[in-house]
Amino acid sequence: MNDSQTISSLQSICVYCGSGPGKDPAYLKTAHAFGRILAQSRIGLVYGGGSLGLMGEIARSVLDHGGHVTGIIPGFLSEREHMLIEAQELIVVDDMHQRKQLMFIKSDAFVALPGGLGTLEEFVEQLTWSQLGRHAKPIVLLNIEGFWDPLLVLFDRMGAEGFIRPGLELNMLVVDRVEDIIPTIDKALGAYPAVSEAQVEAEVSTKF
């Protein structure tokens, strides 16, 4: 990091991504790059606690570059996904609900890299919570090599067919380059003053 690079005010980012590497080498390369960027920006990683695939790649990259990693994993996945025991903070919980709750509490923003059904479910859940006024934390979709293009088309179709109503648009930021993630989140945080959960809920209630 050069002397002119600004340190983000973000404390931690939750990253959703696959427990496999995917077929395109760009996925692992990008996960590694984002881990380096997080560490150099002094932003902690909150993630699913595994050591395999994109999950393991980003976590090890954060550690290799002197950053902090918080892994949160249910006990029944601790062997299947091979916990990353090198993480500074490794929390074993009872179930997926506790995992997602803690990941939410410990994070200032959310980023989704390529992944499978688990990644998609976690990402969409944050979009839903935001749409329902449960939080206003930035949610970023990293669209590596157009991986998420079909999902974006589906979201557009939902809007066109009236299932995502005007005023309840998805609170989602889409970026194509890993180096744009943190500036995009910082810009989003700076554009909106801090509001209470009650204020967010009151605004959303007028849309139904």
Which sequence ranges carry the predicted segments?
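A cross-family phosphate/adenosyl-ligand binding-site feature
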Residues: N2-K106, G146-E179, A188-F208
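Arginine/glycine-rich "motif VI" loop of SF2 helicases in the C-terminal RecA-like domain
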Residues: L63, W129-K137, F163-R165
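Active-site/ligand-binding-proximal alpha/beta "capping" segment
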Residues: Q98-G133, V140, A191-Q199
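Hydrophobic "lid"/C-terminal helical patch
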Residues: I185
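Short acidic/polar capping segments at secondary-structure boundaries
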Residues: G116-G118, L132, E145-F147, V178-D180
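Short loop-to-beta-strand entry elements in the cores of soluble alpha/beta enzymes
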Residues: A136-E145, V174
